[in-house]
Amino acid sequence: MIQEQTMLDVADNSGARSVMCIKVLGGSHRRYAAIGDIIKVTVKEAIPRGKVKKGDVLKAVVVRTKKGVRRPDGSVIRFDGNACVILNNNTEQPIGTRIFGPVTRELRSEKFMKIISLAPEVL
C-alpha cells in the first residue's frame, strides 16, 4: 500500500535511485496504490548523467510492495521493500532499458508487457 509521502526504490536504470510518491492516480480521493497502479513521483536521489534528475516529477508504476499482493488461490507475495519503475509522462512506457529485481504477474496487462519482458524474474 503506497500513499502520498511514501519513499520508494527505483527498479530500473533510468538514473533515479529513490523517489517519493506525491499523488496516487485514478480517482479524486484515492488514498492507496498497490502493485500495478500508476502514481506520480518526484525524484529525491539520482545518479550523475542519468536520464532523470533530482526534482523531476514523473509517473511511475508500483512493481513491489511490503504489503504484497493476494492471489486467487489465497497465497500472498510480499517483498522486503517498496519499488517502482519510472514511466514516460506521455506514453506511460518505461524510461529505463533494464529492470532490477523480481516483478509480479499482476503487471501482465497490455500496458506493462514491456516491464514483464525486461524483468529478470516474474513471480
UniProtKB/Swiss-Prot annotation:
SUPFAM superfamilies cross-referenced by the UniProt entry: Ribosomal protein L14 (SSF50193)
GO biological process: translation
Keyword Ribonucleoprotein attributed: yes
Keywords annotated in UniProt: Ribonucleoprotein, Ribosomal protein, RNA-binding, rRNA-binding
GO CC entries: cytosolic large ribosomal subunit
Role played: Binds to 23S rRNA. Forms part of two intersubunit bridges in the 70S ribosome.
HAMAP family: Ribosomal_uL14
Family listed: Belongs to the universal ribosomal protein uL14 family.
Record text on subunit structure and interactions: Part of the 50S ribosomal subunit. Forms a cluster with proteins L3 and L19. In the 70S ribosome, L14 and L19 interact and together make contacts with the 16S rRNA in bridges B5 and B8.
Protein name in the entry: Large ribosomal subunit protein uL14
